[in-house]
UniProtKB/Swiss-Prot annotation:
Residues 1-552 are mitochondrial matrix. It comes from the Eukaryota. Keywords: Membrane, Mitochondrion, Mitochondrion inner membrane, Mitochondrion nucleoid, Transmembrane, Transmembrane helix. This is Mitochondrial nucleoid-associated protein 1. The lineage of its organism: Eukaryota, Metazoa, Chordata, Craniata, Vertebrata. Residues 142-168, 183-202, 410-441 are annotated as: Disordered.
Length: 609
């Protein structure tokens, strides 16, 4: 028996040989099987687990990151809203209506694209206590000052579960007493809501206060039922719907006022939210006068008045001018009649934009908002073409005065008749120079000043000396002989009240002559100038252009004195021509040298001159 080795038995659980298997079996049963019988199933699980973790990991990270971003954005926006309107009774709270829902694992691809699906739910029996008195005013402020997400809440379609009145739903949406859909967010947002909002009251019902005040709430919340998932398209549609309803409400109240009901609606929008926001105030009085004042942060303002009664036109104009001067400190544009404009011109003051209106339409003020759609270049070209056509019909060139303005503003141009041009154009010859001297320095006048300087530099030295035109034409210095100048040299010249002679040659025609090609001189003609008359003309011209020549630059001054030098030489050359008749003009020797060599009498006579 000792030769036979002891029999070894294999444990069915741990697969190990034991001499005493019975003593080992209870211990192995308690531990459990290390390698189960279905080894294939357990070997396939470690291969699938990492894949599931890889798919769920980024989804969880995206959901957490975007949830934190939404919370921080909501807190910042709501804190700004509370700081912007501390005196108002309507309180804004963080949006508790945003609920993060995870999709099922079978839709993994859709969850990666849209991991967050906000759901808005309302409680069934919520009747919040409100502290404001006028619901319509609160609705205006809330609709204008809230962010796009809060405007989404206003255009929210009612879910099938909540069966509450539109007025109660609107009140709960305005105050912000919407609870989240998930239970873990109930704990988070329950501390942020105050006690007066969480408490419910059975006595207070907003739909019984005033049906007229609740019209806007019913209009805003009158939307079809549907699911609570909202897309960016629904966001833009909701914003447009709120704004159109507000504009319709404002228009209906304006029509009610015209029938005899006085109303006063003020809509304000915070400039911090939008830098290019407008502040519109509609003030309606019993006289039928409507003042539309539009302010913008860029400094562009416009005051337009339409008066119902023509008798009170002048008084209302003076009142609004004073109000605009006090309220709008920069960038204002005053619309005045011809009498006020001429009174200010006599004192040396001219408004920023002068609007000359004919007598037939003195008390009729038309809106100039339609001209903003047209471009500035098209208006200027059409205006110049009309002026040229009128000049060809009347055989004269009238004054061209173009008022330039920024494209965001308005453009108002009206031509002046010939009598108005002759009456108003008596102080200075150049209209652009007068506009530069009398109008204040602003970006509006910088463009006109630059254009005026260019035209003045090209024709400086001609418009200030009308007595010298025959000399220029006789010498052939000018590039061609315009018909207008030949006719003007024979016409009697205008005389101003100060005793000065004014030129009738227009500024536009003088500048256009420089573009023409040069022609050979037609020959020297006799002139009736004397030395004293020439010096007198130079002195008068210098006195006229002394005030504006400083801004013209160096080129205009050199051209001016070059013209004077040529005229003086032509005068002396004509005198020599009369004395030197025997000499042939086709000789190569200059006439002055020939006179000095041939005869001493002629030389003595020239020295005496």
């Amino acid at each position: 028996m000792s030769d036979n080795p002891p029999r070894m038995e294999v444990c069915p659980y741990c697969k190990k040989p034991f001499k005493r298997l019975k003593s080992h079996l209870p211990y192995c049963k308690m531990i459990g099987p290390t390698i189960p019988t279905d080894q294939k199933v357990y070997q396939s699980k470690p291969a699938t687990l990492p894949r599931a973790k890889k798919m769920k990991g980024p989804i969880k990270d995206l959901i957490k990151a975007k949830g934190k971003e939404l919370e921080t954005e909501n807190e910042e926006r709501n804190s700004k809203l509370v700081v912007d309107k501390p005196e108002q009774t309507v309180k804004t709270f963080p949006l508790p209506a945003v609920g993060l829902e995870r999709a099922a694992t079978t839709k993994a691809d859709k969850d990666i694209k849209n991991p967050i699906q906000p759901s808005f739910k309302m409680l069934k029996n919520t009747k919040p206590m409100t502290t404001f008195q006028e619901e319509t005013k609160a609705q205006f402020y809330a609709s204008e000052k809230t962010s796009p997400k809060r405007e989404l809440a206003k255009d929210l379609p009612k879910s099938g579960e909540s069966r509450c009145n539109p007025s109660e739903a609107g009140a709960s949406l305005l105050v912000g007493s919407i609870e989240p859909s998930l239970s873990n967010q109930d704990r988070k947002y329950s501390s942020t809501l105050p006690n007066d909002v969480q408490t419910t009251s059975g006595d207070l019902k907003l739909d019984k206060i005033d049906p007229q005040r609740q019209e806007l709430l019913v209009k805003l919340l009158d939307v079809p039922t549907g699911d609570c998932h909202i897309s960016p398209k629904n966001v833009s549609d909701g914003v447009k719907r709120v704004r159109t309803l507000l504009s319709n409400e404002r228009d209906s109240k304006g029509r009610d006022h015209l029938s005899g009901v006085p109303t006063d609606v003020t809509v304000t929008e915070t400039p911090e939210k939008n830098t290019e926001s407008l502040i519109l105030s509609l003030k309606m009085s019993s006289l039928g006068k409507i003042q539309v004042m539009e302010k913008q942060e860029k400094g562009l303002t416009l005051g337009v008045e339409t008066c119902g009664s023509k008798g009170n036109a002048e008084k209302s104009m003076s009142a609004t001018e004073k109000q605009e001067r006090t309220v709008m400190s920069h960038g204002c544009e005053n619309f005045n009649t011809r009498d006020s404009v001429t009174g200010k011109e006599s004192q040396g003051e001219r408004p920023h934009l002068s609007l000359f209106i004919p007598r037939e339409t003195t008390y009729q003020f038309h809106s100039v908002s339609q001209s903003s759609s047209q471009s500035l270049a098209s208006l200027a070209t059409t205006f110049l073409q009309e002026k040229k056509a009128e000049a060809q019909n009347h055989h004269c060139v009238p004054d061209v005065k173009a008022l330039m303005e920024s494209p965001e503003g308005q453009l108002s141009l009206e031509p002046k008749s010939d009598s108005q041009f002759q009456a108003s154009h008596t102080g200075c010859q150049s209209p652009l120079c007068s506009a530069q001297r009398h109008t204040p320095q602003s970006p509006f006048t910088n463009h006109a000043a630059a254009a005026g300087r260019k035209t003045l530099r090209s024709c400086m030295g001609l418009e200030w000396f009308p007595e010298l035109y025959p000399g220029y034409l006789g010498l052939g210095v000018l590039p061609g002989k315009p018909q207008c100048w030949n006719a003007m040299t024979q016409k009697p010249q205008l005389i101003s009240p100060q005793g000065e002679r004014l030129s009738q040659v227009s500024l536009l025609e003088r500048s256009s002559t420089h573009i023409r090609s040069l022609e050979p001189p037609a020959g020297l003609t006799t002139s009736n100038f004397s030395l004293m008359r020439l010096l007198g003309a130079v002195q008068k011209g210098w006195i006229r252009c002394n005030t504006t020549i400083r801004k013209s630059g160096f080129g205009g001054i050199t051209m001016l004195f070059t013209g004077y030098f040529v005229l003086c030489c032509s005068w002396s050359f004509r005198r020599l021509k009369k004395l030197c008749r025997p000499l042939p003009w086709k000789s190569t020797v200059p006439p002055c040298i020939g006179v000095a060599k041939t005869t001493g009498d002629c030389r003595s006579k020239t020295c005496l001159d």
